[in-house]
Structures are given as C-alpha cells and as structure tokens.
Amino acid sequence: MASSLPLETVMSCPRLDDRSGATAAPKSLAFSIDRIMSKTSEPKAAAAEERSEGKKTVGLCSPIPCMIPIQPFSYDLQAKALMNYSEFWKVNFRGALCTSAAMCKTNCGVCSKADAGIKHSVLPGTRVIKPQVIHQALAMPANGSLCYFNYLDSAYQSELLSGHLFSSAIANSQAQAISAHQKLLLLENAKLACVSPEKFPTPQYPHKEHLPGQLDQIVRESHNLTEKNGVKAHSKTNNCSSDGKPKNFTCEVCGKVFNAHYNLTRHMPVHTGARPFVCKVCGKGFRQASTLCRHKIIHTQEKPHKCNQCGKAFNRSSTLNTHIRIHAGYKPFVCEFCGKGFHQKGNYKNHKLTHSGEKQYKCSICSKAFHQIYNLTFHMHTHNDKKPFTCGTCGKGFCRNFDLKKHIRKLHDNANCLSGGNDSSRGHQN
C-alpha cells in the first residue's frame, strides 16, 4: 500500500537544482531512493516546502535514468481501459510542449499561462508532467485516479521525450470532449484489464512488465469507461443519430428491426442461406463461427454430462437439459399446422418448412431439393462417396452421425456395439 501522501510522479527537475544550490550527488540520490522504497515520510524541510507550495511532486535530480519502481497499489483495475499514449499525445499535445522551467512553477497546473498552445486540453490544478529520461516509470494515484507509462523500448522515444503524462482526472472532467474524438478513446483497440498488484514493478525488477506487450500504454481509470457505464454507453453513441435518438436497422426481407448494424449483418444469412463456417469432420455449415466452435464439441470423446435416468452422456449441459425433456414428456414447441410437438426449437423450425413446401436448396448434380442447406451439404456426400461416419460392426458408412446411430440401434442393438461403433467412427474421422 502506498504511503498516505499521494505520489503523483517522480521526475528530474532543473529548478530544484537551483533551489538546493547544487546538483544532487549520487549519495543523496541513493538516500532518496531508499527513503521512497521504505515508504517513510519525507525530510521535514522537503515536507514543509511541499505544504507551503501545495505540490505533490517528488523531485529526483540526477543525470542518470530514473530506476525507481512503482509501489503496488491497492487499486481495483477491473475497469481500467488501455489507451495508446503516443496517439493521444499526437492528437492533443503536438506542438504544445512546455519547458523544464515551466514545470517547476508553483502555478503549473497548465504548465504556465504563457504556454497557450495547450489551451483547454488540461485543467487548472492538474499536473502536467514532462519526462526527462526514457527509462522512467511514472505513476499518479491521486484522488482515485491512476496513470502509468513506461518509456522502455518505446517505438516513439524521440517524440515521447518531450511528451506529457497526465492524470485521468483530465479525461474524467472532459467526458463529452473525449466522446467527440474517437481517436482519443481508441475503443476499437481498448481492452479491459484485470491486473493483480504483484504484476507491478518490484525493487528487484524496476521495469517489470505489468501489462505484457503494452509498455507503450496508459492504464487509465475512469468511471466513464467501465464496462457498464462507459464502453456500452460509447457503443450506443455510435448507433445514435445526430439528435441523440437510437438508430433502427431494419431487415428488408422480413422487416425485423435491430438496434445495431452488426446485429443486422449477423441476421442476413438467415435469408441468404450462407453458412461460411463448415465443420471439417461432418461438413455441417454454420452462420457464425461461435456456433461452429460449440458444434465441434460433439466430435470429441469427452461427455461429462450424464442423464441420471438413462445414463446417456452429452458434451454440453444444455444438450442434457434438452434430453431431460424426453423423459418428462415435455414438448414445448408445437406446430400450429398439424399439432406435432418437439423437444427442441430447431426441430420445430425444420418441421415447419415441410408445411411451406418451399425447397430452395437444390443439388446441382441431381436437382434434388431440400428445405435447409445443411441437408444439401450432407446430400452432396452421396455424389463424392464421402461418408465420414462408419459403423464399427459392419463397416457401413454414413454421411451423418445421426444416420449412423439410427443404423446401430436398428441392426446392432447392443450397448457394446454402440460404444464400439462410435469409437470407430471417431477414429475414422481423425
């Protein structure tokens, strides 16, 4: 836990050299490092000077790179968003750099009044830091905010030497301005990070990478960027019109309305029949990659979910829950045309297509038509002699695993044969 005095940054400062009358010697530097690392209070003179000026900056004047690590803070980093610092600096601070002298003025909340280049990018009372060395780790845990930046191995060292680091209080107070600049937010590259305190730099490893691969990043804490209030709220702004009203995206085929264009895009394959994600084992196609990933589980041998009544095992718990409906006789999906009931919604939808008489998926070889595209996919195996599911008892091949199981139940109604047939078919697939 950090000391009670909020640590805003550690930096080199020529003005402090002038006040002390001489450049700090290595011995005094080592003393300062030991004092900070041991979390003891500052010398009385330094503390009195800080109280008189109302500053929070600890100055370490040395020509060598600052190797003082950040102490582990008891901050909840669950809602921290990562933001590329170099992009932020290019947008807000290019051509508006403050000097080292300006950094040491008592009223340097905005560097100086004469430094008009920054304008309203920062607010009075907010520290704007100009780093003096490349290998410098900065932290500003003050008033519930935390910013961290590490210049080590930065790809923008020449520019970042004259860059600025600022507290997230600036961004929090300018929420509307930030929302107006998508480059500033960089939400398309933002990630929510959950970093444990042990990943912060330690005395043994001053520049320990606390965010792997993200040295050129700022960890920015903001209540406006939490997953609930910020990221979702920002995504809503992209789907709102200029007057603030939410946009509606309507499907031109069926008239279904969506609140985001992305959802409309996911919906369109329902009408086009496109199933670009195809299982390499059985050839079944899917509209979404996530559905294909869930489907692949059925081809594995792991079936941890077992039915307590019949002992049948399943890959997923949701499949087991659907299976339990069979024992309970529960068929919640009833066809409004013939009254036939179904345990699963998918089977119900497939059955309804038989009443419509529409078979839009036709085989290019034999012109046989099907209600659904995956039935056509399985049918194509009959033309290329591809039958990935083989019975382990008689060696007969099938295009679908369902047909193999039905064959085993009818002709080889034996539990051992069923187990052997499944194992054999899986071995043939792999």
Swiss-Prot record:
UniProt zinc finger (C2H2-type) residues: 249-271, 277-299, 305-327, 333-355, 361-383, 389-412
Alphabetically ordered keywords of this record: Developmental protein, Differentiation, DNA-binding, Metal-binding, Neurogenesis, Nucleus, Repeat, Repressor, Transcription, Transcription regulation, Zinc, Zinc-finger
Pfam families per UniProt: zf-C2H2, zf-C2H2_6
GO molecular function ontology, one term from the record: zinc ion binding
Gene Ontology BP annotations: central nervous system neuron development; commissural neuron axon guidance; diencephalon development; forebrain development; forebrain neuron differentiation; hypothalamus development; mammillary body development; negative regulation of DNA-templated transcription
Principal localisation: nucleus
Functional description taken from the UniProt entry: Transcription repressor. Component of the regulatory cascade that controls the development of dopaminergic (DA) and serotonergic (5HT) neurons.
Any further remark recorded for this protein: In one-eyed pinhead (oep) and cyclops (cyc) mutants, expression in the ventral forebrain was eliminated. Overexpression induced ectopic dlx2 and dlx6 expression. The tof mutant has a reduced number of tyrosine hydroxylase-positive and dopamine beta-hydroxylase-negative DA neurons.
Family, as annotated: Belongs to the krueppel C2H2-type zinc-finger protein family.
This protein's name: Fez family zinc finger protein 2
